[in-house]
């Protein structure tokens, strides 16, 4: 045990991934740990050693996994787990939380961004209550929008990494409500000319109210795919392609925006 769970030895292995079973997660990103007989990690010290080893490891990751609900069909995602025992005390260092509904990349996010990312991977029947609780506690903006029906239709199966010439790899996935800050940064990287051609009028700011309306997609008639570069959880959005089917259902409007640093990507979107 002392050899296997030595964080220095673990850290010598590049890309070491520590997968830790969780019992509960709250919207602040805090985790209550799961304890069971079948765990490889037998105690809290081994867990901390595994965690520290992943932190030391080059490109290492710490992933917490849990089902969205327990065996009694009660939610494992809470507004707060402050009163739960066996809490993990390094929530700022958690890279990912995984459920059967997706992955929340938490690295470097604010509390508000964490809350939105975690709500997106909670059980669909629990999301609206979590959202309203987060607004009441002022974790989210008072005017924050959340389209419950659209969240149920999120096309989780669309997720693909494509390699391009020059060693460039881009991950394509559907846009999320929690992409607000990333999409705002992308907007401010555009020239005035690019903004005009995309939105057909001049825009100098992209406030929260306007951006969140754009991000809350009605998946029944709209598709929005973003492209990300960089390590998972640390990547940045460099592009978005969107189509909107008209009311007749016979035609659609298509718009593609690409970070000017990556000009030439638009034709790849059409093939994707």
Regions inferred by a protein language model and the residue ranges of each:
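Long, contiguous binding/interaction regions
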Residues: 151-272
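Conserved phosphate- and dinucleotide-binding cores of soluble alpha/beta proteins
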Residues: 1-145
